[in-house]
Structure formats: C-alpha cells, structure tokens
Regions:
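Alpha-helical transmembrane segments in multi-pass membrane proteins
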Residues: 16-22, 27-65, 88-95, 116-131, ...
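Residue-level signature of the transmembrane alpha-helical core
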Residues: 22, 54, 94-95, 128, ...
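Membrane-interface helix termini and inter-helical loops of multi-pass transporters
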Residues: 37-43, 108-119, 180-188, 237-244
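Membrane-interface helix/loop boundary segments of multi-pass membrane proteins
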Residues: 141-168, 208-217
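Membrane-helix boundary elements
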Residues: 165-189
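C-terminal membrane module of polytopic membrane proteins
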Residues: 214-291
Length: 291
C-alpha cells in the first residue's frame, strides 16, 4: 500500500472499506454470473464464497491494519473468534428465526409445518445442518467487515440505532449483484432491493443488539446470520408448505416485530455499553451508553 493511499485510508476508513467491498463484490459477481450461464466451470459456489471472504473480511483487516496497526488487527481477530458467551445467546442466534417462522406459518396455514417437521425430521441433519455449517463460514466472513469493522466503528460515533441505519444503506446495495443474479434483470434486482429493504434494516438492528450483548462477538453474529439464511433457504423449502407470498411474509414477520420491540425496549440503545477490550479509534467519538 503506497504512502498516499495509506494516508487516504487513515483519513477515510469507512469510505475506503466500502470502496474495496463494492469493487471486489462486482468483480466476483461477474464470474458468478458467467458460471450460471455455463461459461465458467465449477458452478457459482466457489466464486460466491471467495467473494464473501475477499469482499468483506479482507477489506476490513486491511483498513484496520492501516488505521490501528497490529493491535487493531489482533482485536478484530479476537472478536471474530469470541465464542465464550452465555448459552442463551447461542440458543437465540440458532433458533429464534426458525422457531418464529414455524409459529408464524402455523398461524397462517395451520398445523402443516408441525406435521412436516414430524414426518421429515431427518432432513434437519442431512440437509439443514450441512447448509448451516457452510453458511456460517461465508456469513462470518461478511460480518467481520460489516459488523466487526463498520458497525463497531460507527456505533462508537453515532450510537447503535443510528449506526444500524447508516450501515443498512450500503448493506442493502451490497446485495444488488446477488439480486441481479437471481432475477437476471436490473428491474428485477431493484424490485428485490425494495422488497427486502425493511427486513434488511430490521436484521441489522437485531445483529447490533446481539453483538452488544455478547461482548462484541462477531462469531455469534455470523451464527445468527447463517441461521437466518438457512431458515429462509432449505428449512423453509422443506418444512413450510405455503405459497411463495406466504413464505415471504413468514420469513420477514418475526424479524420486523422483534427488531421493533428491541428498539423500543432498549430505547434505541440496543444494549450498547462499555466493554473491557474496547479501543479508542482515531477520528471517532466514543459514547458510553447504558443498556
């Protein structure tokens, strides 16, 4: 990294992170699109996984290294690997979304989801669990950048709820290439962007609350993200027998309600407060707020 670029990164760490994320994300989305059209081998998964790692985690570590040096990098690594948290947070991260989905589906379509769970429960181990493990690897890489670096830095300056709102905008745009892959058209991608805008905002609020309650554990946030994607993917396909419209409402309903309740109960603070290893970051104003 040249001296001039390093100086710019130090002065504008958030902008530097986002520039790198978007450049890499677009670059990786291209081969992913080509493999879907059988123009590149191996299928799209290797390129998608590479994009999650190189596109979010690597920029975060590069910026942290430039701004905070080795101490900052060690701190981010510790938070990424922080797994010693209370059992209740593991239960919440893993089971909140699937349980809420089953309850919402039961309210909408009757006992069919419960019957599907009783009849096809082996799929929880043969289909759902393998997907969850792969999703944990890829989503942990994303959360290193978006929560471990970006949100963590912004909540020190703006407080957590406002920081969640700020992160939400680039986070939503980050998904545009994926929406384009799914729909194959720009209008379709923009439509999905609009449909998922509010659920994505609410998910960022829940992520912030979970992060602050687990001593800034990026690992637990990645686990929650993986459980969410697993629920909206194979779990819903196998155990939520409903129309596509009902499935969408089921998936987002619990997230929206939970985010609103948490924001109201914590008065927007999302359990933010001082932690033992929190570091002052250059160019930020650190606030101490009681949970």
């Amino acid at each position: 990294m040249s001296v001039s670029i390093r100086r710019w990164v130090v002065r504008h760490p958030v902008a530097a992170f986002l520039v790198m994320v978007y450049v890499v994300n677009i670059a990786v989305a291209l081969p992913s699109n080509l493999t879907r059209r059988d123009l590149l081998p191996f299928g799209f998964a290797p390129y998608d996984l590479l994009g999650h790692i190189v596109g979010s985690a690597v920029p975060a570590f590069l910026v942290v290294a430039a701004v905070l040096g080795r101490g900052g990098v060690r701190d981010l690594v510790r938070r990424t690997l922080r797994w010693r948290v209370k059992v209740r947070w593991y239960l919440l991260a893993l089971f909140f979304v699937p349980v809420a989905s089953v309850l919402a589906a039961t309210a909408l379509v009757g006992t069919a989801p419960l019957e599907a769970l009783g009849d096809k429960w082996p799929l929880l181990f043969t289909v759902v669990l393998p997907y969850l493990l792969l999703a944990l690897f890829s989503n942990l890489a994303k959360e290193i950048g978006w929560t471990g670096f970006l949100f963590d830095r912004l909540q020190n300056r703006y407080a957590p709820l406002k920081a969640s709102l700020i992160v939400w905008v680039p986070w939503a745009l980050f998904h545009l290439p994926g929406f384009y892959e799914e729909t194959g058209s720009a209008p379709g991608a923009l439509l999905l962007l609009g449909l998922f805008a509010i659920p994505q905002l609410c998910s960022r609020v829940l992520v912030a609350w979970l992060y602050n309650n687990t001593n800034r554990s990026v690992f637990l946030v990645g686990l929650f993200h993986a459980a969410f994607n697993t629920t909206t993917g194979p779990f819903t396909r196998e155990f939520i027998p409903a129309t596509a419209e009902d499935q969408f409402l089921i998936q987002i309903g619990g997230i929206i309600i939970a985010a609103i309740l948490i924001a109201v109960i914590t008065r927007g603070r999302l359990s933010y407060g001082p932690v033992a290893d929190q570091r002052e970051q250059p160019g930020t104003i650190t606030r101490r707020v009681r949970s």
